[in-house]
């Protein structure tokens, strides 16, 4: 009588594929499922930068809510306390607000919409850019959006990740248009069209809704278009060459943003 090749148990007549008893076959199936689950990459591994940025935004929002800030209709004073951008404080002695304001949101609807947009764009950005290029592009575009808002509306407050998100869209538009990426022409045209429509629709929406700070959107978008265009030439270069170029690009960009901040600080009048 044949025996199971796994456990040595005698097999009943009737045929058993590969000479494995039902019990061992069931155990092997369960073990294979567990191994597949263990080896399956998590979202954090697949989208590390996007997951980290979204996690930071959610943590700030939870911190605000747990401290007593309304999750649906927060007061301006609470938003400013948590790092919103406002001319009186940002230009006086708290310049870090041009960065922290990108992680402060005006209620749950605001953060949900922004994080949904970031998740959608981030899935693409993780494939086009390396991690540092993605994160620095997002950060610098967010700062550029804050500076645009500060320069044009110094007496208003600003908060939210939309400037950085517009910047990410702009960088992707430039990368797909100028970067010679190894993407089929049809897919590239379709992606470009979707990115342009995303930016155009949201700019139009921002123009017709008075409460939306479209200057931050435009500032972030322009910064992203420029950064993406400058970075595009080395997106497919060898790692050492790409990293060297990235360092130079963001060093110069940082100096430019710093100079813009001091120009606004000197010439823009705020109450």
Ranges and model annotations:
Residues 2-271:
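A detector for small-residue-rich transmembrane helices and their helix-helix packing motifs
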């Amino acid at each position: 009588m044949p025996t199971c090749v796994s456990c040595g148990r005698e097999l009943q007549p009737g045929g058993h594929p590969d000479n494995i008893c039902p019990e061992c076959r069931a155990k092997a199936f369960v073990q294979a499922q567990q191994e597949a689950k263990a080896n399956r990459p998590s979202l954090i591994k697949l989208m590390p930068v996007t997951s980290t940025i979204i996690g930071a935004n959610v943590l700030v929002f939870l911190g605000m809510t747990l401290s007593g800030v309304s999750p649906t209709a927060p007061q301006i004073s609470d938003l400013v306390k948590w790092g919103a951008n406002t001319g009186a404080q940002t230009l006086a002695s708290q310049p870090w607000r041009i960065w922290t304001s990108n992680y402060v949101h005006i209620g749950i609807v605001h953060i949900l919409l922004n994080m949904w947009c970031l998740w959608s764009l981030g899935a693409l950005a993780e494939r086009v850019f390396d991690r540092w290029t993605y994160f620095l592009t997002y950060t610098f575009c967010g700062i550029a959006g804050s500076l645009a808002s500060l320069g044009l509306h110094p007496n208003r407050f600003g908060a939210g990740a939309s400037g950085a998100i517009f910047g990410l869209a702009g960088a992707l538009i430039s990368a797909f248009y100028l970067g010679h990426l190894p993407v089929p022409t049809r897919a590239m045209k379709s992606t470009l069209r979707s990115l342009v429509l995303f930016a155009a629709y949201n700019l139009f929406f921002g123009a017709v809704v008075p409460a939306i700070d479209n200057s931050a959107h435009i500032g972030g978008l322009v910064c992203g278009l420029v950064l993406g265009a400058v970075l595009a030439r080395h997106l497919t270069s060898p790692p050492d060459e790409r990293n060297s170029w990235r360092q130079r690009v963001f060093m110069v960009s940082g100096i430019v943003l710093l100079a813009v901040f001091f120009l606004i600080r000197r010439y823009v009048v705020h109450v």
